[in-house]
Design a protein with these regions (language model features):
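Glycine-rich dinucleotide-binding loop and its adjacent helix/turn
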Residues: 43-105, 109, 120, 153, ...
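Feature captures the FAD/FMN-dependent oxidoreductase FAD-binding
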Residues: 1-40
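A Rossmann-like FAD-binding core segment of flavoenzymes
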Residues: 101-206, 269-306, 312
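C-terminal, flexible cofactor-proximal segment of oxidoreductases
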Residues: 227, 241-355
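Conserved SAM/SAH-binding loop
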Residues: 8-12, 26-28, 71-73, 155-157, ...
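Lumenal/extracellular "mature" regions of secretory-pathway glycan-modifying transferases
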Residues: 30-36, 52-79, 113, 126-154
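Glycine/threonine-rich phosphate-binding loop and adjacent beta-strand/alpha-helix elements that clamp
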Residues: 183, 188-267
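Short hydrophobic core segments
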Residues: 11, 35-49, 83-86, 176-186
Length: 355
């Protein structure tokens, strides 16, 4: 494998040509560019490389500091007393827990921090106040641990006024916030594809319109368009494939399986992937049942690619059924014990880690 891997190399441009894909790459050591032509491209640059900070009206009025959760390391290095965390999924909840002294990992001054964390006031902005965190304690629940009840839950930010105060959807205001931590996810980065090139000028991966915020920039967005039912192959040209787009999954087994399936399709060892019930939500397990007679077009844009536990089981089992039978156990359907362990993930985490 080392013979075909180029380390410290950045892909700066990839475009369709008559005999394949012309890829321009740049060596970060020599600062020199090279051009190669390939039969197919598999984009596997991950879901967590381009942090997303949403556009909030008046954000330039904010007088404190800002950071994305991707840049967070330890709570004692933040040097802030009044902190707002925007987002209530895994990263936001983990950071809020550590800031309030509920940490379980050990670092140089973790015990000292747990004592001094009482001097920090933590606010957490939920997108939907009616919904408690899916996989964490609810700070508003009296039965939650003491560290959790220290978190002050607020709604989504509506705007920031000229005095630098944060105004929320219910009209509440927060002043003198030292630090905003944006736990607002990541964008898919396709900066090496140019919108003016074929076939993207006809069937763009990223579309910006007035109704949705699908495109934060011309090269990155939270939504990709014109993919097949499986969120893998680019429909106008299946020689372009994306690996690892689904979220809320166990990533390594799924990515390994997608890669194997993509290789089989591109090498002609199995037919193109069949249609499924694409009009059903991505998180619905029933969606991932093969529907060979489905002629209805699937949606042109996939939202946030959230698959989820039960749908992941059917998604992977169906993909496995398309591959030639193999002997190694890693290419078998998820065994019952593994499915049960996944279903009890939150319960096991609280039992073993305390949160």
């Amino acid at each position: 494998m080392l013979d075909v891997i180029r380390f410290r190399t950045e892909v700066v441009h990839a475009r369709r040509v008559q005999n394949g894909w012309r890829v321009t790459s740049r060596s970060l050591d020599e600062q020199s560019e090279s051009n190669d032509v390939f039969d197919a491209i598999l984009v596997a640059n991950g879901n967590c490389a381009t942090p997303h900070i949403p556009s909030v009206p008046g954000l330039d009025h904010f007088r404190g500091r800002q950071m994305h959760s991707a840049w967070y390391r330890y709570p004692d290095t933040l040097n802030a007393r009044r902190i707002l965390i925007v987002g209530s999924n895994s990263s936001g909840s983990d950071i809020a827990r550590e800031l309030c002294g509920g940490a379980v990992r050990q670092w140089r001054i973790s015990e000292e921090w747990q004592r001094s964390s009482e001097n920090v006031t933590v606010y957490q902005s939920y997108h939907d106040l009616a919904k408690p965190p899916k996989s964490d304690y609810d700070p508003r629940d009296p039965a939650s641990p003491a560290w959790c009840r220290r978190i002050h839950v607020v709604g989504p930010i509506q705007h920031i006024d000229e005095q630098g105060a944060l105004v929320f959807s219910d009209g509440a205001r927060l002043e003198d916030i030292d630090l905003i931590i944006w736990a607002t996810g990541f964008l898919h980065n396709v900066s090496f594809f140019q919108a003016k090139d074929e076939p993207f000028c006809q069937a763009p991966l990223i579309v910006h319109n007035q109704q949705t915020s699908t495109a934060a920039t011309i090269a990155s967005a939270d939504t990709l368009h014109h993919l097949d039912d499986w969120m893998m192959f680019y429909k106008p040209d299946p020689s372009l494939c994306f690996i690892g787009l689904p979220k809320h999954v166990v990533p390594f087994p799924l990515v390994q399986l997608q890669s194997r399936v993509a290789a089989h399709v591109l090498l002609g060892k199995i037919p193109p992937l069949p249609r499924v019930r694409a009009q059903l939500p991505i998180s619905d397990p029933e969606r991932w049942i093969i529907d060979e007679y489905n002629e209805a077009p699937g949606p042109e844009a996939w939202g946030n690619f959230i698959l989820g536990r039960e749908a992941e089981f059917v998604y992977t089992d169906t993909l496995l059924s398309l591959l030639p039978r193999s002997q190694p156990p890693e290419w078998q359907p998820f065994p019952p014990w593994r499915r049960e362990l996944r279903r009890k993930g939150i319960e096991k985490r609280r039992e073993l880690l305390g949160y």
